[in-house]
Amino acid sequence: MTTTTTILETCHIPPPPAANDLSIPLSFFDIKWLHYHPVRRLLFYHHPSSKSQFLHTIVPHLKQSLSLALTHYLPVAGNLLYPSNTEKFPQLRYAAGDSVPVTIAESNSDFESLTGNHTRDADQFYDLLPPIPPIEEESDWKLINIFAVQITLFPGEGICIGFSNHHCLGDARSIVGFISAWGEINGIGGYEGFLSNHSDSLSLPIFDRSFINDPNKIDAIFWKVLRNIPLKTASFPLPTNRVRSTFLLRRSDIEKLKTATKSPASSFVAAAAFVWSCMVKSGDKSDENAPELFIIPADARGRVDPPIPENYFGNCIVSSVAQVERGKLAAEDGFAVAAEAIGGEIEGKLKNRDEILRGAENWMSDIFKCFGMSVLGVSGSPKFDLLKADFGWGKARKLEVLSIDGENHSMSLCSSSDFNGGLEVGLSLPRERMAAFEEVFRASIMAASGPARRSPALVEPL
């Protein structure tokens, strides 16, 4: 059957009329993402409904709750302002009349297949993302959309909420906070329940960039580099020439992996190291001395001095890079080596207040040094669980992070939707590369679990 997605409506949802204008300068945490591709995510919900119910009840309620959520998250409805005169500085701005572009659609694609964990063609998911708004011009500024939504009905089966955001808007904690607030307002408790649950000011977002201590003007250092890079309209990486698969690590798997590390390891370290070593073992091993890099992101809120509040909305991500020779990761004890390298970076830098921002002025040049090297990154975190965003339909059935389609290579990481304490790893790779990874993943998890390992069928991409 030919699958199609039909656009039923396009509209713009503003916050309530009383909203005040707001301008936010980009911190050095924000501005480094200026030319980064949009972050694209899909949330699938099992919520059978008819087209009539969808259009006349569900969609109007989602629009209303989105508008109310924007009351507390004004930047989401705004734009990124990029100066035509690069002596000025980019900023986020909400002005009266700004809004979130929303697309309403219907799909006859196979909902069960899309929400599965088996190998699926990556291109088909892009029908569920909102169109990319063009860059607009205003006086001395270029206006770039920073958030867009598409709500797609699968009649009688479920709903997909697809959204894309410019990374300058905020990191995972911030975006998950907004989506969760939208869901909470849309749910059973409504706006009154949301206000009651968030009566403490510390539970609502703050946008004050004065919390970011930048005495060395790192923001200006980054802008001096980034303003020389041509501004381009975002595009979808189609055709991707990739497939997507989800790999499950149950809690028992993670605990057994922890026992195989040389030093005590967290669940994140165990999962990340395992995937990293499997990627290397299943990839090109022609040069054993070549460096393999793993980028470890961490939320700096509460880790820096003075601390940045947890309800700070924006970017606050610090990254560290674990580096190991390819041959060592491809060896039999490659997982333990990977865990030691990742754990060492976390303990030595990311958990050390004196080290976490050391050399921050060199972040841009450090990024450029990684170009052309073999790198694995991470998108998402079980700590900021989008699957729990409940619009009144229960937790999401599946999260797909489409952003990783445009990277070589990155893994998505989230809590398991089916097994308490488990983790789901999402990958986007060429088909043959995915098959090679799957084979190594299966063999390695069985070896780590020992002879009492459960049925091999459970270690396939689920």
UniProtKB/Swiss-Prot annotation:
pH effects: Optimum pH is 8.0. Active over the pH range 6.0-11.0. Stable at pH 7.5 for 20 hours at 20 degrees Celsius.
Reported temperature dependence: Stable below 30 degrees Celsius for 20 minutes at pH 7.0.
Reaction catalysis annotation: pelargonidin 3-O-(6-O-[(E)-caffeoyl]-beta-D-glucoside) 5-O-beta-D-glucoside + malonyl-CoA = 4'''-demalonylsalvianin + CoA
Sorted UniProt keywords: Acyltransferase, Phenylpropanoid metabolism, Transferase
Organism: Salvia splendens (Scarlet sage)
Biological role: Catalyzes the transfer of a malonyl group from malonyl-CoA to the 6'''-hydroxyl group of the 5-glucosyl moiety of anthocyanins. Active towards bisdemalonylsalvianin (pelargonidin 3-O-(6-caffeoyl-beta-D-glucoside) 5-O-beta-D-glucoside) and shisonin, but not towards nodemalonylsalvianin, salvianin, pelargonidin 3,5-diglucoside and delphinidin 3,5-diglucoside.
Protein name: Malonyl-coenzyme:anthocyanin 5-O-glucoside-6'''-O-malonyltransferase
Pathway: Pigment biosynthesis; anthocyanin biosynthesis
Superkingdom of the source species: Eukaryota
Gene name for this UniProt entry: 5MAT1
Lineage: Eukaryota, Viridiplantae, Streptophyta, Embryophyta, Tracheophyta
Broad EC category: transferase
Effect recorded for residue 150 to A: Activity reduced to 67% of wild-type
Expression sites by tissue: Detected in petals and sepals, and at lower levels in bracts and red stems.
Pfam family, one: Transferase
Alphabetical GO biological process terms: anthocyanin-containing compound biosynthetic process; phenylpropanoid metabolic process
Annotated effect of mutating residue 315 to A: Activity reduced to 1.1% of wild-type
